[in-house]
Amino acid sequence: MTEPVRGSSPSSDSARVPAELEAFFRIADRWRLSADDQIKLLGSPGRSTFFKWKKAGGTLPADTVERLSHILSIWKALRILFTIEERADDWIRRPNDFFDGASALDTMLQGRVVDIYRVRQYLDAQRGG
């Protein structure tokens, strides 16, 4: 079983939303993700846990922290590859031959960390990283 991980800030406590989670919610808004999609990308915490995290933060499982790390890296790679933000945001929903015709978002929503990581690897390769 994995140990819970608090937010990255040394002063982080259960009443503060960790910075990486705040960033995720901003990305989710840009990508127009439903609450169900956000929950799936975060590793399928219970709905009450998800809404608690959104409102007040809390302790994040290591699995969720890993997912957030990959999603933030995907966001960064898209910002490097696309100079126009809207194109970067739209790319996530476009069909892609690398993902067998599925979009990057559909691939990530399969629910496993490896699916999110696969999108990250693809984008890292595209930007030469």
Swiss-Prot record:
Key words, A-Z: Plasmid
GO molecular function, a single term = DNA binding
> Taxonomic lineage per UniProt?
Bacteria, Pseudomonadati, Pseudomonadota, Alphaproteobacteria, Hyphomicrobiales
What InterPro entries does the annotation carry?
Xre-like_HTH, Xre/MbcA/ParS-like_toxin-bd
Q: Would you tell me the protein name for this molecule? A: Uncharacterized protein y4oB
One Pfam family of this chain: Xre-like-HTH
Q: Which domain of life is it from?
A: Bacteria
